[in-house]
């Protein structure tokens, strides 16, 4: 399983803005382990290699998502568990969620 283009862009956006080296390292080494589509979003469980250091820091910002391919804007949350990134939630405020959109703006 690979990251969708949107998932990859979100993780890169968060890593580029994080001042925590461990979070950046975790994001750069993570890969998707499973994905659940909910109808208005998705939950992607992330796997991080065991040799990547944990952190006490939290992800401090998650981008808003705008795309003409959705019927409303959306957002995301990168959850952490026991010092490692764990799950990326992506959601739309509308009723139409397409995980493989081709164009978007993260703010």
At which residue positions do the language-model features occur?
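Short secondary-structure capping micro-motifs at structural edges
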Residues: 62-66
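N-terminal domain-onset segments
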Residues: 1-61, 99-107
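Short, compact, well-ordered microdomains
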Residues: 67-107
């Amino acid at each position: 399983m690979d990251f969708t283009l949107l998932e990859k862009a979100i993780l890169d956006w968060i890593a580029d803005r994080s001042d925590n080296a461990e979070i950046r390292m975790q994001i750069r080494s993570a890969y998707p382990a499973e994905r659940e589509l909910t109808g208005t979003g998705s939950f992607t469980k992330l796997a991080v290699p065991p040799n990547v250091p944990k952190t006490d820091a939290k992800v401090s910002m998650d981008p808003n998502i705008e795309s003409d391919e959705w019927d409303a804007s959306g957002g995301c949350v990168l959850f952490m568990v026991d010092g490692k990134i764990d799950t990326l939630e992506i959601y739309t405020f509308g009723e139409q969620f397409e995980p493989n959109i081709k164009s978007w703006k993260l703010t």
